[in-house]
């Protein structure tokens, strides 16, 4: 009670003294213009009187403005000494003890709540951007980098086609500037294709791409993953396609994965494969049955590890694209793949072995071939077998 009375007394003295000081300032300041006006009235020189009156008013105005601006600057300089994030928790700021305790208690509570609010209770997943791990669903495997912009990644596929001539990671020298991503998907996987499942998937791929690029809506994570799966599917499909197939004239199978075959370029090796295929057809027409054709790819930049599913949903099992009996794919290690085409019978009398030289490791005798065939002859020749080494 005594403290409050003392504060009131100090406040009253401050306000009263300030009021008296302002009155004295105004009184002393107004003396000059009043005296000048009185003297000018008594004088008979009107010009001189006018100069005195105007000069006294100007001096009074300048003095008033100077005092006002000085007061403002002094006030701002005093405020600068106070911290911007200053919280009044000291005895001098809050003399009331209970108020200080309440302020300190709420500050500690806010600190705890801020730590809890940084990690949301439920997953926060917005379309268009991959959420960070702390906001993502813990039951969902984290396969994409944080803050990945889905639409920019998908747009890069069309930019690579437009500026670099790359379609699904395959180089093309004859892509026209007027051809779009949709046009190439139609020409490569829909026109002339008798595989209904591939045609339907290509149509779904086009629909998904156009919805993502031109709908104006943000891309969801499920749509982005579906788009990426389709890109991988059709990219693998292009590698396993027959390059003589109608509709593939504009796209080269020179993948950006840098396939090097026995130290030669891809074009030379593909020409050898086409020549070998023609020789096989001529031998078949003459009654000679070539049993095995072996060739080797150096896949140092990719391991092509694919896992079979119940839906048989990857390109190697789409048999309608192969012009002849499909090959068995035997995976030996992470750096090479040997592809063989073998008849269903495993009788030794039927084998007329012919090989092409394939790089550093050559197959030298029939015993080695029979060991290869012993692993695959029990399987129907119209299936694909992949052994991981």
UniProtKB/Swiss-Prot annotation:
Originating species: Candida glabrata (strain ATCC 2001 / BCRC 20586 / JCM 3761 / NBRC 0622 / NRRL Y-65 / CBS 138) (Yeast)
Record has Membrane as a keyword: yes
Described function: Required for growth under high-pressure and low-temperature conditions.
Protein name stated in the entry: Defect at low temperature protein 1
UniProt keyword annotations, A-Z: Membrane, Transmembrane, Transmembrane helix
Extracellular compartment spans: 39-49
UniProt-listed InterPro entries: DLT1 (IPR038869)
Keyword Acyltransferase attributed: no
Family: Belongs to the DLT1 family.
Gene that encodes the chain: DLT1
Cellular compartments annotated: Membrane
């Amino acid at each position: 009670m005594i403290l409050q009375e003392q504060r009131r007394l100090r406040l009253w003295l401050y306000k009263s003294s300030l009021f008296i000081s302002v009155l004295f300032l105004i009184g002393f300041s107004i003396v000059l213009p009043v005296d000048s006006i009185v003297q000018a009235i008594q004088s008979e020189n009107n010009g001189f009187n006018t100069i005195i009156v105007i000069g006294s008013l100007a001096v009074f105005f300048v003095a008033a403005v100077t005092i006002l601006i000085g007061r403002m600057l002094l006030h701002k300089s005093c405020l600068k000494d106070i911290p911007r994030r200053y919280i009044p928790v000291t005895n001098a700021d809050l003399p009331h003890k209970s108020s200080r305790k309440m302020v300190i208690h709420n500050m500690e509570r806010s600190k705890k709540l801020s730590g809890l609010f940084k990690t949301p209770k439920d997953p926060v997943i917005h379309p268009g951007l991959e959420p960070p791990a702390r906001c993502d669903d813990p039951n969902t495997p984290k396969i994409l980098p944080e803050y990945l912009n889905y639409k920019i990644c998908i747009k890069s596929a069309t930019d690579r086609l437009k500026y670099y001539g790359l379609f699904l990671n395959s180089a093309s020298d004859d892509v026209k500037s007027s051809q779009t991503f949709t046009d190439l998907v139609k020409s490569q996987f829909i026109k002339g294709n008798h595989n209904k499942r591939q045609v339907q998937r290509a149509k779904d791929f086009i629909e998904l791409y156009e919805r993502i690029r031109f709908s104006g809506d943000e891309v969801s994570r499920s749509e982005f993953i579906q788009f990426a799966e389709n890109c991988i599917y059709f990219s693998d499909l292009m590698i396993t396609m027959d390059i003589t197939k109608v509709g593939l004239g504009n796209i080269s199978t020179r993948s950006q994965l840098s396939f090097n075959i026995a130290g030669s370029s891809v074009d030379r090796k593909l020409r050898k494969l086409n020549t070998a295929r023609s020789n096989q057809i001529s031998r078949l027409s003459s009654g000679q049955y070539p049993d095995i054709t072996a060739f080797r790819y150096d896949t140092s930049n990719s391991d092509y590890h694919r896992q079979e599913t119940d839906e048989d949903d990857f390109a190697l099992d789409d048999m309608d694209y192969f012009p002849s009996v499909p090959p068995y794919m035997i995976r030996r290690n992470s750096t090479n793949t040997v592809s063989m085409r073998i008849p269903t019978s495993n009788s030794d009398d039927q084998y007329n072995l012919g090989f092409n030289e394939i790089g550093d490791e050559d197959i030298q005798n029939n015993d080695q071939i029979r060991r290869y065939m012993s692993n695959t002859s029990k399987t129907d020749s119209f299936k694909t077998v992949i052994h991981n080494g």
